[in-house]
Amino acid sequence: MLLAALLVGTLAAPPAFAQEPIPRCTAVEPMSGKIGTEIVVTGENLDKQYVAKLYLTDGQNDIEMVIKEQDATTMKSVIPKGAKPGVRYRLMILTRGKEPKLIEQPVRFEVEE
């Protein structure tokens, strides 16, 4: 009986090293546009609890974007003035938490002339 109680208690206990959810972008609409174009990024774990900042990156330069709206599955932003026409950027997220990380996303946006 005592063994059964210990076993149930062990199985019900949360893991000692629970990992924070990782933000992930799965799509951006539209996929191209001019500076000033509003974009909607969809994915998971995109709320303020997990995402501190959003960037466009070409692998050399990172351009911070202003997040206008944000919830668990969407972020709305505008393509900033520093973006260069003709460049196809990846989205990049700065996470929150004890150990913030910059994570490049598999989602791209092309800035039009």
Residue ranges and their predicted role:
Residues 4-6, 16:
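Cleavable N-terminal signal peptides
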Residues 17-113:
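Ser/Thr/Pro-rich low-complexity tracts
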